[in-house]
From Swiss-Prot:
Organism: Thermoplasma volcanium (strain ATCC 51530 / DSM 4299 / JCM 9571 / NBRC 15438 / GSS1)
Annotated positions binding substrate: 75, 207-209, 258, 374-376
Functional summary from the UniProt entry: Catalyzes the conversion of oxaloacetate (OAA) to phosphoenolpyruvate (PEP), the rate-limiting step in the metabolic pathway that produces glucose from lactate and other precursors derived from the citric acid cycle.
Residues that, per the record, bind Mn(2+): 216, 236, 287
Family: Belongs to the phosphoenolpyruvate carboxykinase [GTP] family.
Binding-site residues for GTP, renumbered to this chain: 259-264, 376, 407, 500-503
Alphabetically ordered keywords of this record: Cytoplasm, Decarboxylase, Gluconeogenesis, GTP-binding, Lyase, Manganese, Metal-binding, Nucleotide-binding
Protein name: Phosphoenolpyruvate carboxykinase [GTP]
Statement: the UniProt record of this protein carries the keyword Secreted: no
Active site annotation, chain numbering: 260
Record EC number: 4.1.1.32
Length: 589
């Protein structure tokens, strides 16, 4: 760590830090340098103070367990706000906070919030600092946990300090007293109230998505506004490189709401017969992709530098690459702890002795989960065993397919292809998913999550749809758009499709369709495969038919629900309404 007067940080940034410190009133200010020594010192201090637990070094090298407050365990959408002078900027899906209320929050909860504490200053870059995608930010925080997480998920510290100019995103986080009723995560992508010089404010929370301001707050909510203004896309999407047996790389992005298979797909390894035939995969991003249009092509990159991913359900059968990733240099949040000092979560082999649950209670497995359903692991990208050589390419990689997908037990086929760009935008805009533990609310409820951006779009969702339409209008080489659903169930509740590595069979068809017009059957909702490679897969012909069955009556009901949803949104672009009417007509409705 560096004292502020020891750094070579931009004078404008230094002045901002000093002015913020006057309001927060810390006892000291340290600028984070991003070194291993800094990480180790902070981690050791947290362990000494009982704020973190060092895990079994033999099995989980340089890894730790952090337990959050029991009321601070997930993104809190009802306490997440967009502020503007005009409510219409924010739109129907975001929570609006007037500018004068922001000023009240600033004075009530941030004034003196760091009294007696150290103010950590974290300079970070989203995307490689040398990249055309690069965007810079500074987060100030009183939380060592936040500093350690940003060590892993961003490029931060010394290598970034000298590159920060006059334009950077200003984030201020204060742990506060963790009062859920006074939790605020506020974004100001346009104007700010007088005396509040910040783009993002977060208070009375220390949970990842609420406190790691580089992630959803900057890389999606703030960046999505900037992307609209500058003509690019900031998306809640994985980015995967698939290399075919001829050695050609294909790049696929995919938007999936939390717990809908996004991380598992990003980390997919082909089944053995595919590997033997010469197929391979490499990860670029598991969560966020920035896409710029260059010479009519969609060029994508991962703005982040690490993983902050849900861990329950992860094991060597479901995701061996994730297990390799989290075996070292990892911060676990809200998992269980065995008596031997190993982390434990549902999905791992049972432990029959007593262990500690995520709240620190010693007990045996049974009843309430040992690990919180939204427990997480934070690891650097370089932990991943099959990281693409192009993950830091300053030009980005060319996208050939965009996937939309959600967790649906019925109706939605395993895979289908949109008829055209606008139809694909309609499909993404109307994605319906079953609610997960990653956001607060009743698990299992169905809600619309357009492009998996419902919690993350920083402006009016109808303008966001319009932006997608306009991007398509000015792009010569648009990727094809596909919709996938790994979660269709039989009447007895069991999954029809085996999922996980077998999802690669669907990717093979998608890649084929990006450059061919055959092996597809037209249906009222899009093109489905005429045939998939199912060799060696234990699945009945009846199950395959069910995976692709188009239930017209069910779809008519779906269209009624979409109609209600559009009415709630209000000013939906005409192009999407046109696709809606065409879909109804194809369904004979």
């Amino acid at each position: 760590m560096l004292a502020l007067d020891e750094t070579e940080i931009n004078d404008g940034a230094k002045r901002w830090i000093v002015s913020i410190a006057k309001h927060l009133n810390p006892s000291s200010i340290y600028v984070c340098d991003g070194t291993k020594e800094e990480f180790d010192d902070l981690a050791s201090a947290m362990v000494k103070d009982g704020e973190m637990i060092k895990l079994n070094e033999k099995n989980f090298k340089n890894s730790y367990l952090y337990r959050s407050n029991a009321t601070d365990v997930a993104r809190t959408e009802e306490r997440t706000f967009i502020s503007a002078r005009d409510k219409s900027f924010v739109g129907p899906l975001n929570n609006f906070l007037p500018l004068d209320r922001v000023k009240q929050v600033w004075n009530q909860f941030f004034k003196g919030a760091y009294t007696g504490k150290t103010m950590f200053v974290i300079p970070y870059a989203l995307s490689s600092p040398e990249s055309k995608f690069a965007d810079f930010g500074i987060e100030v925080t009183d939380s060592k946990y936040v500093v350690l997480n940003l060590h892993y998920i961003t490029r931060m510290g010394k290598g970034v300090i000298e590159k920060i100019g006059d334009r950077f995103i200003k984030g201020v986080h204060a742990t506060g007293n963790l009062d859920p009723g006074n939790k605020f995560i506020i974004h100001m992508p346009w104007e700010k109230p007088e005396g509040v010089d910040a783009d993002i404010l977060s208070v009375n929370t220390n949970y990842g998505g609420n406190a790691l301001l580089s992630k959803k707050c900057h890389a999606l909510r703030i960046a999505s506004v900037r992307a609209r203004e500058e003509g690019w896309l900031a998306e809640h999407m994985l980015l995967l490189e698939v290399k075919d047996p001829q050695g050609k790389s294909h790049f696929i992005t995919g938007a999936f709401p939390s717990a809908s298979g996004k991380t598992n797909l990003a980390m997919i390894s082909p089944p053995k017969d595919y590997r033997d035939a010469g197929w391979s995969t490499r990860l670029i991003s598991d969560d966020i992709s920035w896409i710029k249009i260059v010479d009519g092509k969609f060029m994508a990159t991962n703005p982040e530098n690490g993983f902050f991913a849900v861990v329950p359900g992860t094991n060597y059968n479901t995701n061996k690459n994730a297990m390799a990733t989290l075996s070292k240099n990892t911060i676990f949040t809200n998992v269980g702890l065995t008596m031997s000092g190993d982390p434990w979560w549902e999905g791992l082999d049972p432990v029959y002795d007593e262990l500690y649950d995520w709240k620190g209670n010693k007990r045996k497995i049974g009843g309430e989960p040992i690990a919180h359903p939204n427990s997480r692991y934070t690891s650097p990208l370089t932990n991943y065993p099959y990281l693409s050589d192009l993950y830091e390419d300053p030009e980005g990689v060319p996208v050939s397919a965009i996937l939309f997908g959600g967790r649906r037990a019925t109706l939605i086929p395993l895979v289908f292809e949109a008829f055209n760009w606008n139809h694909g935008v309609f499909l993404g805009a109307t994605m319906g998913v079953e609610r997960t533990a990653a956001s607060e609310g009743k698990v299992g409820d169905l809600r619309r999550d357009p492009m998996a951006m419902r919690p993350f779009c920083g402006y009016n969702i109808n303008e966001y749809f319009r932006h997608w339409i306009e991007i398509g209008e000015r792009s010569k080489n648009k990727p094809k758009i596909f919709y996938v659903n790994w979660f269709r169930r039989r009447a007895d509740g069991t999954f029809i499709w085996p999922g996980f590595a077998e999802n690669f069979r669907v990717l093979e068809w998608i890649i084929y369709r990006t450059s061919h017009n055959d092996n597809a059957v037209e249906t009222p909702i899009g093109y489905i495969p005429e045939s998939l490679n199912l060799a060696g897969l234990n699945i009945s012909e009846e199950d395959v038919k069910e995976l692709f069955r188009i239930d017209k009556e069910g779809w008519k009901e779906e269209m009624n629900e979409i109609q209600k949803y559009f009415s709630e949104l209000g000013n939906v672009p005409e192009e999407i309404l046109k696709e809606f009417e065409l879909e109804k007509k194809r369904l004979g409705y």
